[in-house]
């Protein structure tokens, strides 16, 4: 929604529709940080040499679907960046034998599930590996899993009711 709000401002300044440039900036940012996070996973979490980490990063981005998603205006590259970030942080926590806190879990879920809802499930799987079966304790289950899922569902319903539905209704009436 924020890029949508940036575009009218850029249109007012430049006189042209800058949506393509806004999307390109988001895609480039996401692809760049995906490369940074995958390199750090190879280097700091797995522990391979700098040369091997660099080669593996290039190899990863050599896959056709990764290259295509870095260029096509879709949410996949954004999801990949966020999930690689979560994988990096989870790997660092596992290596240092630390646990993921409730607030970290909530932030992870909101950011990743805000891009695509199935990413939230991947975050829960990550929490299972980092925290073990501790995620099934009532406090963690309610505050870190059920409450964020319910708030995300409520936000989705509100955005549909107050943003999408009025626009659809106005388009049908016109």
Where are these predicted regions, by residue range?
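Aromatic-rich transmembrane-lumenal/periplasmic boundary elements in polytopic membrane proteins
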Residues: 145-174
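Short acidic/glycine- and proline-prone juxtamembrane loop motifs at membrane-interface regions
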Residues: 71-77
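Specific aromatic-rich, kink-prone transmembrane helix
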Residues: 78-95
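Membrane-interface helix-boundary motifs at transmembrane edges
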Residues: 43-51, 95-100, 129-140
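Transmembrane-helix signature of polytopic, membrane-embedded enzymes
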Residues: 38-62
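Transmembrane alpha-helices of multi-pass, membrane-embedded glycan-processing enzymes
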Residues: 2-3, 7, 23-37, 79-82
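Membrane-interface alpha helices of multi-pass inner-membrane proteins
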Residues: 99-132, 143-148
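Lumenal/periplasmic acceptor-binding loop at the mouth of the active site in multi-pass
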Residues: 1-21, 173-174
């Amino acid at each position: 929604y924020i890029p949508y709000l940036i575009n009218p401002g850029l249109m007012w300044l430049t006189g042209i529709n800058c949506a393509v440039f806004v999307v390109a900036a988001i895609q480039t940012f996401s692809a760049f940080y995906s490369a940074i996070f995958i390199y750090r996973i190879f280097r700091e979490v797995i522990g391979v040499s700098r040369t091997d980490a660099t080669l593996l990063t290039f190899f990863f981005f050599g896959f056709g679907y990764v290259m295509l998603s870095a260029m096509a205006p879709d949410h996949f590259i954004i999801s990949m960046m966020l999930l690689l970030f979560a994988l990096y942080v989870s790997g660092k926590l596992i290596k240092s034998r630390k646990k993921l806190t409730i607030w970290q879990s909530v932030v992870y879920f909101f950011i990743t599930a805000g891009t695509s809802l199935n990413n939230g499930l991947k975050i829960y799987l990550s929490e299972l590996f980092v925290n073990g079966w501790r995620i099934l304790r009532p406090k963690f289950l309610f505050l870190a899993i059920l409450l964020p899922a319910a708030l995300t569902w409520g936000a989705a319903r509100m955005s549909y009711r107050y943003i999408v539905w009025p626009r659809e209704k106005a388009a049908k009436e016109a």
